[in-house]
Amino acid sequence: MKRVLLLLSFVFAALSTQAADYNILKYGAISDTTRLSTKAVQRAIDACAAAGGGRVVVPTGNYKIGSIFLKSNVHLYLERGATLYGSTKLEDYKPVKTDYVSFRTQQQTIQLIFADKVSNVTIDGYGTIDGRGRAFKKTAVTDEGITRPHLLRFIQSQDIIIRNITLRNSGCWMQHFLACDRIKIDGVTVYNRSTKNNDALDLDGCHDVVVTNLISDSDDDGITLKSTSPRLCENITISNCIVSTHCNAIKLGTETNGGFRNINISNIVVKPSYDQDETIFGRKSGISAISLEMVDGGVLENVNVNNIVVDGTESPIFIRLGNRARGYKEGLAVTNVGKIDGVRISNVRVRNAGPTGCSITGLPGYPVENIHLDNISIHHKGGVTAEAMPKIEESAADEREKSYPEATMWGVLPAKGFFVRHARNVKFTNIEIQTEQEDVRDNFVMIDVKE
């Protein structure tokens, strides 16, 4: 009898320590997209955090919110059939100014779901978060989204899980993780084609990240690694994803103040969007599948890309060392040219590409180094004639050191395969280039390339 009572006491103790659920309906949320439930959802989050953590449950229904703020040990769970809709009014979003210094934190920013200096946070379930981003338009050429709401934004946070949910229609970037550690993103579906700067995923100066089973369709870049502060993106693996984009499917850049180290990317399908009714930015078939850029003085090293299948894109592979030299805060000059050293790209199959070609380029005195490409098959439109070559070569002769890096920055390239300039120890193995139409260009054009 004593043993039974002792066992029961252990069971009750275990049950009492289980994290509780905090249903947003109990805190006043209403399934009605005409009425705000921001305060109710925030009350549930605050109560959960005050109790030491637990699960904030969004039940089946449609809920309208402005900015909400996640806290440590909170698990935001969206039931199947549950949707959190972002308000279409800017006044429903609370501007915040983090103390973390980066290019994108110099001003106040707004976001639908925000977290700064939190740990052990999960967002999952089988529901949807929809930012209704079409309500927020780009107001100026210099507007990079600071005045429009991000959907998810985490800064200086650790142990984050984003799993199984659907994310739609952000006013800016869909997911921005800045200076965060230990992130897992698994089974997330993204549709982000509402307005300008509609990236699918931005990892910015993050460490120890696993991204897997992501399916994304974005008007702007797909899976993007950035470095808008001196903190590198480091120790990141991305695998088993399907990416559709009008811009760059897998991109390291554009901001590269710190750089990228120990990046492994594998088993990626790049394909056109199912929905081609509108292109806000970029091209319907996409600009590039693999874009590795270093233009703001950082370092890019030990990057491995393997087993990529591409349907479309204008210029499948783009590796660029430039010197835009933009600092990560106002008044800070970048005085050094960056470095690209140690890239392997293997087992890439490309079909239906544009005629531009691929490029691997450094700058005079600053070569890209140790670039190995093997087992690459590219089939594209071709069609370049001898009459077109003088203009093509004239465009490519311009180094464009300070220009924004883009795979199409020179237009059609002098090579139908790879245009390589200012490079050391670049190795090609088993490269196949085929064109639909006759094309007079050589497969490879190399300028200032040495062992």
Which residues does each PLM region occupy?
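Sec-dependent N-terminal signal peptides
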Residues: 4-13
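Extracellular/periplasmic carbohydrate-active domains that bind, remodel
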Residues: 8, 18-451
